[in-house]
Amino acid sequence: MPMERDSHEEILNKLNDPELEHSERTELLQQLRADYGSVLSEFSELTSATEKLRAENSDLIVSNSKLFRQVGITKEKEEEIKQEELSETITIEDLEKQAQL
């Protein structure tokens, strides 16, 4: 995990001190180098995670599109079947007319 912004600023401010000993300066620079490495590592991990999520999102969009099209086709067929059933039903009036004949 990278260091906090305040810690980073504090180290940079210490490095600006002309009276800072060489050993302390070296130690502070090593801390910054280590932090930079962790920042790059975390950035790389987050970038790959983002790419993976984008790919999964694209796959889900395609799957949802196919599913919606399939559901639409199924509903259209169900409506056609219902209309055919309704056209084949006999109403009470039709039965009365047939009984009077």
Curated annotation (Swiss-Prot):
Belongs to the phi29likevirus scaffolding protein family. Homodimer. Interacts non-specifically with DNA; probably binds DNA in the early stages of DNA packaging. Gene3D superfamilies: 1.20.5.400. Disulfide bonds: none annotated. This is Capsid assembly scaffolding protein. Residues 1-24 are annotated as: Disordered. The gene is 7. Keywords: Coiled coil, Late protein, Viral capsid assembly, Viral release from host cell. Residues 79-99 form a coiled coil. It holds the Pfam family Scaffolding_pro. Scaffolding protein involved in the icosahedric procapsid assembly. Coassembles with the capsid proteins to form the procapsid. The scaffolding protein is found within the capsid as a serie of concentric shells. During DNA packaging, the scaffolding protein molecules are released from the procapsid.
